[in-house]
Design a protein with these regions (language model features):
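Active-site and ligand/interface coordination hotspots across diverse enzymes
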Residues: 1-52
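Short acidic (Asp/Glu) patches
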Residues: 20, 52-59, 91-99
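Short, basic, glycine/proline-bearing loop/turn elements
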Residues: 41-46, 83-88, 113
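Short, solvent-exposed loop/turn segments at secondary-structure junctions
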Residues: 43-44, 77-78, 118, 146-147
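A short mixed-secondary-structure module that forms the rim of ligand-binding clefts
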Residues: 44-66
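Short connector loops at secondary-structure junctions
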Residues: 68-84
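Glycine/proline-rich loop-helix segments at beta-alpha junctions forming the active-site rim
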Residues: 86-166
Length: 166
């Protein structure tokens, strides 16, 4: 029997707003094990069928830790290739993002935060952390910046082990 999970990308769901301005969650599945979650800053170009450097990096971490898949969420759901776009948009969080974060936190075995210093915008990082905890997650980080924010996985060594994030 052929295992389609490893190579067939048709089964990787993503949740967008109807206008696709906001992406609330993105999944990748390659095995039958539990999922890891990554909660980052904001979505870029990855979608149901296309990966970007960040999702590829998160897949590498999750595979190294023995997970069979991952789910990616963001503290801001606005799709933008430049974080500066978050500062000028009327609603960078997105109308359904907090509920999406709650769902991700409930279903993942491990929740790794990595939104970096832009999480200070509107104190969103602190609020998102509270949402994750209220949903039952014990948030982790690969690195904590000097300012106290969880470092983005794209800029962290592949052999880094996540630690509790206060």
């Amino acid at each position: 029997m052929l295992d389609l999970l490893e190579n067939d990308r048709r089964f990787d769901p993503a949740t967008f707003s109807p206008c696709r301005t906001w992406r609330y969650r993105l999944e990748r599945q390659w095995g039958r094990g539990p999922k890891a979650a990554f909660i980052l800053l904001n979505p870029s170009t990855a979608d149901e069928t296309k990966d970007d450097p960040t999702i590829r990096r998160c897949i590498g971490f999750a595979k190294a830790w023995g997970f069979g898949g991952l789910v990616l969420g963001n503290i801001f759901a606005l799709r933008s290739t430049d974080p500066r776009g978050l500062y000028s948009h009327a609603d960078p969080v997105g109308p359904d993002n907090d509920e999406a974060l709650r769902g991700i936190a409930r279903e993942a075995e491990k929740v790794v935060c990595g939104w970096g210093t832009h999480g200070a915008l509107n104190d969103r990082g602190r609020f998102a952390l509270a949402v994750l905890r209220e949903a039952g997650a014990d948030p982790l980080a690969l690195k904590v910046t000097a300012e106290g924010f969880p470092g983005h996985p794209l800029y962290i060594s592949a052999d880094t082990v996540p630690k509790a994030f206060a």
